[in-house]
A protein has these predicted regions:
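Aromatic (Trp/Tyr) and acidic
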Residues: 33-121, 133, 141-162, 202-244, ...
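Non-transmembrane, juxtamembrane loop and terminal tail segments
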Residues: 497-499
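Zinc-dependent metallopeptidase catalytic helix centered on the HExxH motif
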Residues: 248-252
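Cleavable N-terminal signal peptides of Sec/SRP-targeted secreted and luminal proteins
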Residues: 8-30
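Internal metal/ion-chelating core segments
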Residues: 169-223
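N-terminal secretory signal peptides that target proteins for export/translocation
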Residues: 1-8
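Single-pass type I membrane protein transmembrane segment
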Residues: 462-480
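A conserved hydrophobic secondary-structure block that centers on an alpha-helix together
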Residues: 143-183, 190
């Protein structure tokens, strides 16, 4: 065999090997920015994402969430209203047209408290995002029942801290604090009762399960706002006499025990008192979450899941617990616990921002894979209450809204008729907005969805199928090589057969 023939044969073999490797090796894709371009709305950052610090995409997420809250306003709107498709509404009580225009103070107050708490902890995030004024406007715009009175007192006390310490508005802070004190006094001096017993109409919507957690919660926030130890004494007394220790209930608008553990630990540490009891309470609660000993678990995709609570709005327990973990992490009793709580919180943030089996960021308006059909009448733009699919396409983008979220199998139905998965709510965005402020301060990279190409992933090929493909390709390659080496004999055999 001459050298030219040998080189030719080697070239064919090399080509065959390269072809096989290309079949077996997935093509890598250069990273691109797949986030949707921002709308031309005042206050929405326009700078594209570039992994810089401070990160413009996290700034947008904070701005979008604040925009979402503006879209929820009703009544006589201010002249600086940024939501072009929202107009004055609900100027009367709706009775003359048969509409129920009820507002629910209980979950609204919790929302304000959590946003204020997050802003007190991570105010720098709002400053870096240039959203402090919009935060102020949002918090500023905000019947007998022990639970509601205690929660509303907490909201006003927390807001008073924000206006005093961050916005330098002592006058308004004092007004809020006066209302907070009066509400808490009202909660304590009237007969203890759940508010749905006084207002039965709310029972089917946002009923309360207890009120002692709100009495502790409200007293703690009043202590933080006033430094009056009588409020701390009240909180400790209500806590000790009403069996609130060691509970494993999910922190949300109805249940404050988890938040009380963390806030107790914070306040005792900040005041220089012995905080060991309260850190023990907080860490028992948070360890139960991250170690799955609280009765909850994780979906295959990594979403924190609690049967019952998560069935109604799956992202709610995830975001609420992530919020508490990041609030408490800096004062944990060990660096290992600090890192564990932070890692848990970041995993839930990533899931919500697209690191999930269907590559869906559950924030409206940030990515082509974002939910397109939130269960929201104003954004839908229709006028037929009996038909939520008329028109079929959502008319307005509800930027920043967090939807209910996927099911236990990480599947998501992007249909406005599936209100469990696509409904939006004030309390869904409260922990999310605070978490984005945390990320604005601490993250040096883009949100996960920025590098996620549009489209949902195809089903993954199993390991067995991959092995089978490899074996088949190798066999085909061997056959091709043998056929090449025996080509003369094959040609001669074929020639003889035809004769």
């Amino acid at each position: 065999m001459n050298f030219r023939a040998r080189d030719h044969k080697r070239g064919i073999l090399l080509t065959s090997l390269i072809t096989t490797l290309l079949l077996l090796t997935p093509l890598t894709q250069a990273q691109n920015n797949y986030a949707l371009p921002p709308p031309n709305i005042p206050g929405i950052p326009q700078e594209p994402s570039n992994n810089s610090y401070p990160n413009p995409e996290y700034a947008r997420l904070i701005a979008y969430s604040l925009y979402f809250y503006e879209a929820e306003r009703s009544g006589k709107l201010p002249t600086d209203n940024r939501v072009s498709w929202r107009h004055d509404s609900a100027l009367n009580d709706g009775q003359e047209v048969g509409l129920d225009l009820s507002k629910f103070t209980f979950p609204l107050s919790w929302t304000i408290t959590v946003i204020s708490w997050g802003a007190l902890e991570w105010s720098k995030g709002y400053e870096l995002a240039n959203q402090t004024q919009y935060l102020r406007d949002m918090v500023n715009s905000s019947a007998h029942g022990t639970d509601v009175s205690g929660e509303t007192a907490a909201a006003m006390a927390a807001s008073s801290l924000l206006f005093r310490n961050q916005f330098n508005d002592t006058g308004y802070a004092n007004t809020l604090l006066t209302y907070a004190k009066n509400l808490y006094s009202f909660a304590e001096t009237t007969p203890f009762t759940l508010y749905q017993n006084s207002v039965p109409q709310v029972k089917s919507a946002y009923s309360s399960s207890s009120y002692f957690d709100e009495l502790v919660w409200g007293a703690l926030w009043l202590y933080r706002a006033t430094n009056d130890t009588s409020y701390l004494d009240k909180a400790v007394n209500y806590f000790n006499t009403n069996s609130l220790s060691g509970l494993k209930k999910i922190f949300n608008w109805d249940e404050k025990s988890g938040g009380c553990y963390v806030l107790f630990a914070q306040l005792f540490q900040q005041s220089g008192q012995d905080s060991s009891k309260w850190k023990s309470e907080a860490e028992r609660y948070l360890d139960g979450i991250v170690n799955q000993s609280d009765g909850c678990t994780f979906t295959n995709g990594g979403l924190y899941w609690c049967d019952g609570d998560s069935d109604q709005a799956s992202l709610n327990p995830s975001l609420d617990t992530a919020f508490l973990c990041l609030i408490y992490a800096p004062i944990a009793t060990s660096s290992a616990k600090t890192q564990t709580y932070v890692n848990f919180a970041l995993s839930q943030i990533d899931y919500v921002l697209g690191k999930n089996p269907i590559n869906t960021p559950y924030v409206v308006g940030v990515h082509p894979n974002s939910p397109q059909n939130p269960h929201h009448a104003g954004a839908h733009g229709g006028n037929d209450v009996s038909n939520l699919n008329n028109p079929p396409q959502t008319q307005h983008v509800l930027y920043g809204a967090i939807v209910g979220g996927p099911n236990k199998k990480d599947k998501f139905s992007d249909s406005r008729t599936d209100f469990i998965q696509t409904e939006v709510a004030l309390d869904y965005n409260a922990p999310f907005q605070s978490l984005m402020a945390y990320q604005m301060i601490n993250s040096r990279s883009d949100p996960y969805y920025v590098n996620v190409p549009p489209g949902k992933p195809q089903p993954k090929i199993s390991v067995g199928a991959i092995v089978a493909i490899v074996i088949i390709c190798v066999i085909l390659l061997i056959i091709a090589i043998l056929l090449f080496l025996k080509r003369k004999k094959i040609a001669e055999w074929w020639k003889n057969r035809r004769q």
